[in-house]
Amino acid sequence: MQRQVVFATSEMYPFSKSGGLGDVLGALPLALHRMGVPTAVVTPFYGRLRTADYPIRLTVSDCHVGYPWAPITCDVFEADYHGMPVYFIHRGEYFDRRYYYNDHKGDYFDNCERFVFFCRALLALMRRLGQPPAVLHAHDWQTALVPAFLYFLRQGDPFWQDTRSVLTIHNLAFQGRFASRLFETSGLPPQAWSVDGAEFWGDFNLLKAGIAYADKVTTVSPSYAREILGPAYGSGLDGILRKRAHALHGILNGADYDIWSPGNDRFLPCRYTPTDLAGKAQCKRALIEELGLDPHLARRPILGFIGRLRGQKGIDLLLDILPRLMESDVGVIILGEGNLTHEARALELMEAYRGRVCTIVSYTEDLAHRIQAGSDIFLMPSRYEPCGLTQMYALRYGTPPVATAVGGLRDTIVPWPSPESTGFTFGRCESAAFLRAILDAVHLWTTAPGDWQGMVRRAMAQAFTWERAGRAYLDLYAQLGVSPGEEGA
């Protein structure tokens, strides 16, 4: 039996998704699978799991999840996703809920218990299936204990001797930080409770444990890997990251162009390509009509924002400068939800500038596609951005971004006025700098249509493919001395 790369994740599109993590885990494993790498994914069986297009079946019943004090069982279901197995850990008391991590009251009180269980259940499933993986690849705090458990299992269990671990950090700010008493019930050995392990200012930090014990740690862009080594972006973990700097790598995410491409997008009223951009203008007119914007905006630039309405995404900067933008006779579309104060303010501005500003406090996948296609300029004023996917989508849709020069935004946007420019960036994450960059974009759109069309075509030619990212991960696995696909014992 060939040894697999097994991905551990709390989300995987199309089965579950709350943000970019789900998109990545819906694409990267599949890219490796299509490259001939034996690959599997393990994820929770949520109460609102979307399985209509991929029927699931019970594959393991009463899988015993070993805890020091008592065995707990779970059932495991399986789906065939384009020929790749996806396993779903089912235990109703932990995962049969409307939302993944929180509800309107806040984070679920038992999140630590839920995801400690998931990590242990994944390892129990691998034992039950009888074949140790070549690589266990965990993602974010929810699965960060997989590398930690593996580190200690390898010291005494021959089954795991040749398995290596990778932890990918999608957003360092979310760490899974819990009360110290929960460490005692996690099943990690006492020696893991140290300043170089799972302990963080007296708390149990799941992500820190993964960083400490994974064989390799990656982030989702090269720039973010460098940024988190310092206190400005390190979220308190820059110390442990500097200690593990030799194991830290930045690998840029890809974009799923099977889903996000204006030449084959089923959500668009008209498709278009770099050689035939007429359809983009038609998408713009259709979007203006759909959202009830003033028809004259068909002849003016429309600025689109898609993202969580939270401080990290810089929505407050956009709301601060929006009245000033209205003086330039532009349209603004905001799609997202998040902080209630930001939501209310965005809705108030829509009322104040009815017909020129549209705020949709929700997220729908189809409308996101139409905003990418129908906007002229895409706004992404993030205070930090580990990678970012929406700017990659904007580039492919010929909607040059205006973005902060941080993290993955720095790695994916060539800033104007370079002859190879694909968008606009600004250095200081503040309202004045953001406004200047937007006005530069509006000026170019208005006064130099030929230069603008050149930028649009260059943007659409960018190719941040998952195959490229997959090859980078295969190189990383090779550094660990493992070759997925080799026959196991």
Curated annotation (Swiss-Prot):
Chain positions recorded as ADP-alpha-D-glucose binding sites: K17
Organism: Nitratidesulfovibrio vulgaris (strain DP4) (Desulfovibrio vulgaris)
The EC number(s) this enzyme carries: 2.4.1.21
Broad EC category: transferase
One MF annotation (Gene Ontology) recorded for this entry: alpha-1,4-glucan glucosyltransferase (UDP-glucose donor) activity
Family statement drawn from the similarity comment of this UniProt entry: Belongs to the glycosyltransferase 1 family. Bacterial/plant glycogen synthase subfamily.
Database matches in InterPro entries: Glyco_trans_1 (IPR001296), GS/SS (IPR011835), Starch_synth_cat_dom (IPR013534)
Record pathway: Glycan biosynthesis; glycogen biosynthesis
Record has Glycosyltransferase as a keyword: yes
Catalytically driven reaction(s): [(1->4)-alpha-D-glucosyl](n) + ADP-alpha-D-glucose = [(1->4)-alpha-D-glucosyl](n+1) + ADP + H(+)
Function: Synthesizes alpha-1,4-glucan chains using ADP-glucose.
Coiled coil residues, start to end: none
Protein encoded by which gene: glgA
GO biological process terms on file: glycogen biosynthetic process
Keyword set, alphabetical order: Glycogen biosynthesis, Glycosyltransferase, Transferase
Protein's recorded name: Glycogen synthase
Superkingdom to which the source organism belongs: Bacteria
Keyword flag Transferase: yes
